[in-house]
Amino acid sequence: MSGDYEDDLCRRALILVSDLCARVRDADTNDRCQEFNELRIRGYPRGPDADISVSLLSVIVTFCGIVLLGVSLFVSWKLCWVPWRDKGGSAVGGGPLRKDLAPGVGLAGLVGGGGHHLGASLGGHPLLGGPHHHGHTAHHPPFAELLEPGGLGGSEPPEPSYLDMDSYPEAAVASVVAAGVKPSQTSPELPSEGGTGSGLLLLPPSGGGLPSAQSHQQVTSLAPTTRYPALPRPLTQQTLTTQADPSTEERPPALPLPLPGGEEKAKLIGQIKPELYQGTGPGGRRGGGSGEAGAPCGRISFALRYLYGSDHLVVRILQALDLPAKDSNGFSDPYVKIYLLPDRKKKFQTKVHRKTLNPIFNETFQFSVPLAELAQRKLHFSVYDFDRFSRHDLIGQVVLDNLLELAEQPPDRPLWRDILEGGSEKADLGELNFSLCYLPTAGRLTVTIIKASNLKAMDLTGFSDPYVKASLISEGRRLKKRKTSIKKNTLNPTYNEALVFDVAPESVENVGLSIAVVDYDCIGHNEVIGVCRVGPEAADPHGREHWAEMLANPRKPVEHWHQLVEEKTLSSFTKGGKGLSEKENSE
């Protein structure tokens, strides 16, 4: 289009020039000149893009101005209005507080400050003499009729709990200060024993008024400055009944406050448990076998019933009380294993209960045992403390005989037995069933992993994720290794998987197998549950017998059960030789 426009312009210019040259004085000259000027102006029009650019620029400038104005207003409000408001609010709220401190120095401002009364929400706590109210809902587990006070052994008192120092009423705090204990929100003082400060006196004052400023000055001078390094743990029944010698440690004298009516009453809410301050073993765990053998370690409740139609002994584990603390935090992670003596073929295990000394299990198990054999059988309970990174600690055990007589008791009356401290019990890691088959002509050794039973629980859920790894060993060195699949959340996995190794006939007398059951962890390192070893130079006689039977019966699978042991128990694969380390077994 630009070419046509220029041609038209040139053509009209030529016509105009010719007209001007031909008729200089013609009247149409002015009209021609006007037409040429209009055509020239039309050739250079003002584009619409310029108008759009100006409009867009004006919109952007306006928006930026509005944003800057908003930011400046917000900054001014934060710098000027908020500090002024806070200053004014504190001045208004601080006036009455100082006014209250003048005549009586209120404890709300002395202890915690802030303009609110301490313990207003717990004014009716039973420890403070007010109306009783429940702090939590009672737990009603399944088979609750077996836990009623009518059962054998009676009901057990509930475990007391601690209250936060900030939740005590002013009268309680006054009694604490009067008893020589300095209140604190972070680490409250532990009370002393007996009449020399054995507990905190949570009693209301005989007079209804607040203490004076002079009394507060005297109380401040009586407050001790020493503190214990940690908060006390929750109390148990055993702790509440423990009495210490008051002459062993000096305590500031207690100032008991009388109740209205002339009677004095003290509530014990904290007490030192001496066994918690004994020396700890490796890893911060306290030794559980230093005490006298057979000493009681709490109590366990259960119920028995025999089903004559199906020849089953039903065992229901209900709860345990007053277990000893095996962890450095003052608690344990208990679980119970049960099995029938003397064969121990079938074992059961409860779930692990975290951080408790009074676990409630309510789990039922069944043993298949004929009625004729029940009189010769004994039921064995083993209470363990779960430990994720080391060997589980044996808390205690109970051996029960006369099963038929006990099973005939009414089912609504549970049985209570004392848990006796056990000695050094052999680690029960489980058993592994596999077969060996050797083909001399093909030089092939086939290891068929069939199943495992009663494996050690390695996870907090009370289960493991086991797989089996077999390693071909020669002179303490690993030549080859094979693995099975992983079985999730089980202690009795079934595999039925074959692991094949190439072994020349001339070398079969110089090699052996190290078979490890490993717990798989998606995060972290896999952990070895237990190992067993077979071969001509195996330390276990059962492993040597299995290998010899395989060589004596070529082309036939020879199946055996093997007891799993800890890696450190079998320090070497051969007699006097060098074995695989735990790291090599877990790889």
UniProtKB/Swiss-Prot annotation:
GO terms for molecular function: calcium-dependent phospholipid binding; identical protein binding; metal ion binding; protein heterodimerization activity; protein homodimerization activity. Ca(2+) 4 binds at residues 459, 465, 519, 521. Residues 10-34 are annotated as: Cysteine motif. Residues 213-224 have a biased composition (Polar residues). Residues 76-587 are cytoplasmic. Changing residue 10 to A: Abolishes disulfide-dependent homodimerization. Abolishes disulfide-dependent homodimerization. Residues 183-205, 229-244 have a biased composition (Low complexity). It is found in: Cell membrane; Cytoplasmic vesicle, Secretory vesicle membrane. Its main location: membrane. Ca(2+) 3 binds at residues 387, 390, 393. The keyword Transcription does not apply. The modification Omega-N-methylarginine is found at residue 286. Residues 1-54 are vesicular. Ca(2+) 2 binds at residues 327, 385, 387, 393. It is a single-pass membrane protein. Coiled coil: none annotated. PANTHER family: SYNAPTOTAGMIN, SYNAPTOTAGMIN-3. The cysteine motif mediates homo- or heterodimer formation via formation of disulfide bonds. Ca(2+) sensor involved in Ca(2+)-dependent exocytosis of secretory vesicles through Ca(2+) and phospholipid binding to the C2 domain. Ca(2+) induces binding of the C2-domains to phospholipid membranes and to assembled SNARE-complexes; both actions contribute to triggering exocytosis. Plays a role in dendrite formation by melanocytes. This is Synaptotagmin-3. It comes from Mus musculus.
